[in-house]
Regions:
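Conserved alpha-helical scaffold segments that buttress catalytic/binding sites
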Residues: 1-202
C-alpha cells in the first residue's frame, strides 16, 4: 500500500508541475490522501471540500491509521483547523463528530451551506473530493458503505453552479464498486458525475 500511495503522490506532483489539474477516479477513498499532500505542497493555503456520507475522521480503523475511514483525519494532520469543509455527512462515531465540531466545518445530511462556503473561499485553491456514497443508495447502491438518506443526482447538478465558481486545483471521485451493483446503474451515475464535473470546472 505504501508504494501505491507514494506513486499516486508522485504522479500528482508531476501533473501539478505541468500546471495541469489532477482529476482522479478511484475506488478506495484513501487515495485522496497522497493527492492532497502533493497539492498542499504546491498550494499551502489549500482548502478541502468533501462530499461524503461519512466523516472519515477516525484516528484509526481496525488498528490501521491509513484507511478510507481515517483519510480526512490524516489530511487534517497537515492541513490544520478550519480548512476542511464536509457536506452530506450522515454517519460517523461520536468522537468523530466531536472532532469535527472543534476542527472542521461539517454540514450534516445534505449540501446546505455550500453557497456560503464557496463565497467565503473565493479565489482560494480548493481540492474537491467526492465520495460517491454521498448519494442515496436508492440511486447509488454500488459502494462499499452505503448510507440511507443521501443526496440525489439533480441536487448534485444544482451544487455545480456553486462549485464552478471555485478555484479547484485538483479533485477526485471515489468509492464506486461496480461488483456491488450488477445493474450498472451506479457505474452510469458515476460516469455522469465525472462528466458534469468536467463541464463545470472546464
Amino acid at each position: 500500500m505504501d508504494l501505491a500511495l507514494a506513486d499516486i503522490k508522485a504522479r500528482t506532483q508531476t501533473i501539478l508541475a505541468d500546471n495541469k489539474r489532477p482529476f482522479m477516479i478511484d475506488g478506495e477513498h484513501l487515495v485522496t490522501l497522497p493527492a492532497v499532500e502533493a497539492t498542499f505542497e504546491k498550494y499551502p493555503d489549500l482548502q478541502v471540500i468533501q462530499f461524503d456520507a461519512h466523516t472519515d475522521l477516525r484516528e484509526a480503523y481496525l488498528d490501521a491509521k491509513l484507511s478510507h475511514a481515517t483519510v480526512i483525519r490524516r489530511i487534517h494532520d497537515f492541513l490544520g483547523d478550519g480548512k476542511i469543509h464536509q457536506f452530506g455527512i450522515r454517519s460517523g462515531e461520536r468522537a468523530e463528530f466531536q472532532f469535527a465540531k472543534e476542527h472542521t466545518n461539517l454540514h450534516k445530511y445534505n449540501l446546505d451551506g455550500l453557497k456560503e462556503t464557496v463565497a467565503a473561499l473565493k479565489d482560494t485553491p480548493v481540492y474537491l473530493t467526492i465520495d460517491l456514497d454521498v448519494f442515496d443508495p436508492g440511486v447509488f447502491p454500488g459502494t462499499g458503505t452505503p448510507e440511507a438518506g443521501g443526496i440525489f443526482f439533480m441536487e448534485f447538478v444544482e451544487s455545480l453552479k456553486s462549485i464552478s465558481q471555485l478555484n479547484i486545483v485538483a479533485l477526485d471521485v471515489n468509492e464506486l464498486s461496480p461488483a456491488l451493483d450488477q445493474s450498472g446503474a451506479s457505474t452510469a451515475l458515476a460516469c455522469k458525475v465525472v462528466r458534469e464535473l468536467l463541464l463545470a470546472i472546464h
